[in-house]
Regions:
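Phosphate/ATP-binding catalytic cores across multiple sugar-kinase/actin-like superfamilies
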Residues: 102-110, 217-238
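A mobile "lid/hinge" subdomain adjacent to the ATP/sugar-phosphate binding pocket shared
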Residues: 173-218
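Short beta-strand-loop/turn "lid" adjacent to the catalytic site in phosphate-handling enzymes
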Residues: 1-39, 58-60, 66-75
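Glycine-rich phosphate-binding loops at beta-strand->alpha-helix junctions
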Residues: 241-263
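Beta-strand segments within the central parallel beta-sheet cores of soluble alpha/beta enzyme folds
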Residues: 117-123, 178-187, 242-244
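Short mixed-charge
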Residues: 266-279
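Glycine-rich phosphate-binding loop of actin/hexokinase-like ATP-binding domains
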Residues: 67-172
Length: 279
């Protein structure tokens, strides 16, 4: 072992690129615990475990938020009092950055596109899911926000939701904000919308094919949300040269890819090669 790489969820505004870990870096990761409470503590534990097991070997932190740091202010700022951004760094960061960065560049190579100007949309669709838009490999926009809760319908995450829903559920169910956020993170998405059927897209698809009403509605909403994001990003970039799929569902679900391409994106000039799609 020459070196050890660590995917760290949230770098806040502190990190704009990968970095060799030292005590200052670990302290900064700790300072981002409140931004990534589900992931950053575990990420730091992994780093410290590797330091003990492999003393003297360099550890490199690769931040999920780095790709989204390339967005312009019009994309990353929320329409809330600006003081909250200045005081607390509240903004849209985006996640799955290592995936979006790599896949967008690979799509450019595969398609023989102009590496400086190619407009690429990447659909990272797995249990966690996000869509990104980039021009020449630089992030223009991405669907996740301050946390990975924003954006697409995911396995157990709600994705986009009216913020007032949180207070409404708190009042109706006598729950704390933390309890409701836990529901939105761990009990919503495909799992919640299907009535607790499953967080796995394969199970939802199978149930929908058997006539399960909520499963069908959930699957329709799932693809519809993806289609909307891709459409909005094509508009934001004034066109798109390539749409790439990755992650568990994106890579392996033939039907989801086919439905998105045929049902929603014909106006973009998308034509799916069914033989290649089944390969």
């Amino acid at each position: 072992i020459n070196a050890i790489g660590h995917r760290v969820l949230h770098g806040g505004t502190k990190f704009t690129k990968s970095i060799v870990v030292n005590e200052d870096v670990k302290a900064a990761i700790r300072e981002c615990f409140d931004l990534g409470p589900l992931h950053n503590p575990a990420n730091l534990m992994g780093i410290e475990a590797c330091e003990k097991v492999c003393p003297g070997k360099p550890n490199v932190a690769v931040f999920d938020t780095t790709f989204g740091m390339g967005m312009d202010e019009k994309s990353y700022l929320y329409a809330i009092p600006h003081e909250y951004h200045e005081k607390y760094g509240i903004r849209r960061y985006g996640f799955h950055g290592t995936s979006h960065s790599f896949v967008s560049k690979e799509a450019i190579k595969f398609g023989g596109l102009d590496p400086e100007n190619a407009k690429v949309i990447v659909c990272h669709i797995g249990n966690g899911a996000s869509v990104s838009a980039s021009i020449g490999g630089k992030c223009v926009d991405t669907s996740m926000g301050l946390t990975p809760l924003e954006g697409l319908i995911m396995g157990t995450r709600s994705g986009d939701i009216d913020p007032a829903v949180v207070q409404y559920i708190c009042n109706k169910e006598n729950k704390s904000v933390d309890e409701v956020l836990n529901i939105l993170n761990k009990k919503s998405g495909l799992l919640g919308m299907s009535g607790g059927l499953s967080s796995d897209c394969r199970d939802i698809t199978a149930a929908a094919e058997e006539g399960h009403h909520l499963a069908k509605v959930t699957l329709d909403a799932y693809t519809y949300r993806i289609a909307k994001y891709v459409g909005s990003y094509a508009a934001a970039m004034n066109g798109v040269d390539a749409i790439a799929f990755t992650a568990g569902v994106g890579e392996n679900d033939i039907e989801i890819r086919e439905e998105l391409c045929e049902k929603y994106w014909g106006y973009l000039g998308v034509k799916i090669d069914k033989e290649a799609n089944h390969t």
